[in-house]
Structures are given as structure tokens and as C-alpha cells.
Design a protein with these regions (language model features):
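Acidic-glycine-rich active-site phosphate/pyrophosphate-binding loop
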Residues: 1-12, 152-162
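Charged, low-complexity interaction tracts
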Residues: 2-20, 175-176, 183, 189-191
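Predominant activation on well-ordered alpha-helical scaffold segments within soluble catalytic domains
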Residues: 2-5, 28-37, 86, 123-130, ...
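A residue-level detector for conformationally permissive "hinge/kink" positions
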Residues: 3, 20, 25, 148, ...
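Long, contiguous hydrophobic alpha-helical segments, chiefly transmembrane helices and signal peptides
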Residues: 4, 22, 26-31, 140, ...
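Glycine-rich, mobile lid/loop segments that gate access to catalytic sites or pores
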Residues: 8-118
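Glycine-rich anion/phosphate-binding loop at the beta-strand->alpha-helix junction
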Residues: 96-191
Length: 191
């Protein structure tokens, strides 16, 4: 927890656990996010998030069904992974230990060209995720996997879709090219 750093900077530690770095602080973000999601829906933009990994248990994208995330308490869109993660968490609790996880956020319907090419780069999205106390890293698209991929593996080649518009065959870039949205789903993960 951030008690140490808050005490060092401000000379104050909220022993009740309700300080600025408390997980309870995120409730305002959740409420505002729910309102923002409803407003964005009116513009044809859909935002949703789910748990894609807990400890070593990750969803299998071939089994992924977004509607399934509402059917388990871990919000995992893969029934099998959700059961494995439940078992893993029970083991962690029995050992009086904890583990990390990954939350994936997807934004669909965002038109191409949102963001800036130099400094803003849709930065507020990643910045907001990094402002959550427990988050240690954020990646877009394939993220750090790009570092161990070849250019031909990681390249999103362009094509013309059935409506005659430019599109990408894959989305390794996570819907962001040069800091701007490219009209593909924006995919952001936080761990």
C-alpha cells in the first residue's frame, strides 16, 4: 500500500485505510465511468472491461464470450478460465497469500483520428489506468509482446472491408497507431 510514500511526502498516514490511495477512492471513477459509458453509447462507442487473467490463469480467446463475464464473480468471459481462477484464488487464500491479475478494457466504435500524434496520444486513457493505486503497468494491443515478435508477426496489414473502407486484418496495435485511434477496437490492459 502507499502508506509509506504518503507519510514520507505529506507527513501523514491514514491508519483507517481510507486515504487518497485507498481502493475505496475508485468508487467515484466507477460511478463517473458508468455515466460516461452511457453517453458514449449514444455516439456509437461501446466501452467494456473484463478480467483477462488472475495469477497464472488467463482466458483462452477462442472460448471468449463477453456475455459470459456476467455469469461469474470474477468477470472472466471464459467459463473454464473462471473456474480455474476460482480454484487458484481459493488456494491463495488457504496459503494466506494473494496474487495479481489483468483487467482488459475494450473500446469499440471509436472513429479514426482521436488523439494526438506527439504528446497526448490518447494518453488520458492510460494515465487514468495508471492512477489506480494497485496498477503497475499498462499496455496497448499486444503491448510488450511486440518486443519479442518479429515485424512480420506484429504488423497489422491493411485491406478494404466489405463496406469499402480501409481496415486492418489484425489488431496487434490495439487500435492505436501513432498515438491516434485507427477505428479498430482500442484494447488496453492494466496489471
Amino acid at each position: 500500500h502507499a502508506d509509506f510514500t504518503f507519510d514520507q511526502k505529506y507527513g501523514f498516514r491514514d491508519y483507517r485505510g481510507g486515504g487518497r490511495s485507498s481502493g475505496r477512492e475508485t468508487i467515484g471513477r466507477v460511478a463517473a465511468g458508468a455515466v460516461a459509458a452511457k453517453l458514449l453509447e449514444r455516439l456509437g462507442v461501446r466501452v467494456f472491461a473484463y478480467t483477462s487473467a488472475i495469477g497464472p490463469v488467463s482466458i483462452d480467446r477462442s472460448r471468449m464470450e463477453i456475455s459470459k463475464m456476467w455469469e461469474n464473480r470474477l468477470y472472466m468471459p471464459d467459463d473454464i478460465a473462471a473456474k480455474e481462477a476460482e480454484s487458484y484464488l481459493e488456494d491463495m487464500m488457504a496459503r494466506r497469500d494473494s496474487c495479481g491479475g489483468v483487467v482488459e478494457c475494450v473500446i469499440e466504435g471509436l472513429p479514426a483520428g482521436v488523439g494526438e500524434p506527439v504528446f497526448d496520444k490518447l494518453m488520458r486513457l492510460w494515465q487514468s489506468m495508471m492512477s489506480i493505486g494497485a496498477v503497475k503497468g499498462v499496455e496497448i494491443g499486444d503491448g510488450f509482446e511486440a518486443a519479442v515478435s518479429t515485424g512480420s508477426q506484429n504488423n497489422d496489414s491493411f485491406c478494404i472491408d466489405s463496406a469499402g473502407h480501409p481496415a486492418k486484418r489484425t489488431n496487434h496495435s490495439g487500435g492505436v497507431l501513432g498515438g491516434m485511434s485507427d477505428s479498430s477496437p482500442v484494447v488496453i490492459r492494466a496489471a
